[in-house]
């Protein structure tokens, strides 16, 4: 990451991400779960996490059902514990930001498929976030435009390859697309 000098202040430039994972109707159906896993890894705290999943309309309902099942079975727990699961986010400030953005997604009309606000059951200590999936998102909603830096996946339907590319490229964060 490049360093810069501004007056007498040193700063580090960050390259954020709001990557899109494009799923076409002829894709391996397991690409849906793999995309969710890539979003949720590290509790979503990766600037290259594919946090927008663009799904071709002809397989959209199947994708939403698969995401619901997968996300509801996804484990959250102590990072010292053996096994596949995600741990807490970095701080109370980040936890609160994620909770605010999840609520904003609900308020803006995105359909909550799995997860939501609050902590996962049994995890009262620490800043644990429920892996969350929103359906029926459009690219103008905050959950699609803001780098949440948490385990929150926004699913956006598309009809044509050109439309998918247009949506994928319509972001202020150009770090990655899948």
Name each model feature, range by range.
Residues 108-114, 173-178:
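Bilobed periplasmic-binding protein-like "clamshell/Venus-flytrap" ligand-binding domains
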Residues 19-25, 36, 49-53, 133, ...:
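Adenylate-forming
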Residues 22, 75, 102, 121, ...:
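Conserved C-terminal structural/oligomerization subdomain of aldehyde/semialdehyde dehydrogenase
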Residues 1-7, 11-12:
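Single conserved hydrophobic/aromatic residue that forms the stacking wall/gate
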Residues 16-18, 45-52, 68-100, 117-128, ...:
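Flexible, acidic loop-helix segments that line cofactor/substrate-binding pockets
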Residues 17, 56, 67, 105, ...:
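Residue-level signal for inorganic ion chemistry
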Residues 28-37, 57-75:
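Conserved core segment of the aminotransferase class I/II
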């Amino acid at each position: 990451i490049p360093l810069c000098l501004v007056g007498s202040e040193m700063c580090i430039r960050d390259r954020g991400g709001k990557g899109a994972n494009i799923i076409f109707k002829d894709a391996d159906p397991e690409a849906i779960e793999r995309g969710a896993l890539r979003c949720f890894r590290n509790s979503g705290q990766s600037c290259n996490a594919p946090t927008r999943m663009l799904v071709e309309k002809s397989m959209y309902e199947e994708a939403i059902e698969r995401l619901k099942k997968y996300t509801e079975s996804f484990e959250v727990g102590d990072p010292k514990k053996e096994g596949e699961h995600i741990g807490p986010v970095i701080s109370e400030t980040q936890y609160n930001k994620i909770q605010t953005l999840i609520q904003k997604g609900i308020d803006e009309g995105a359909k909550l498929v799995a997860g939501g606000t609050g902590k996962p059951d049994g995890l009262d200590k620490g800043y644990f976030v429920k892996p969350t999936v929103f359906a029926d998102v459009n690219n103008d909603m905050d959950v699609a435009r803001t780098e949440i830096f948490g385990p929150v996946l926004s699913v956006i339907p598309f009809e044509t390859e050109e439309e998918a590319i247009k949506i994928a490229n319509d972001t202020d964060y150009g770090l990655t697309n899948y």
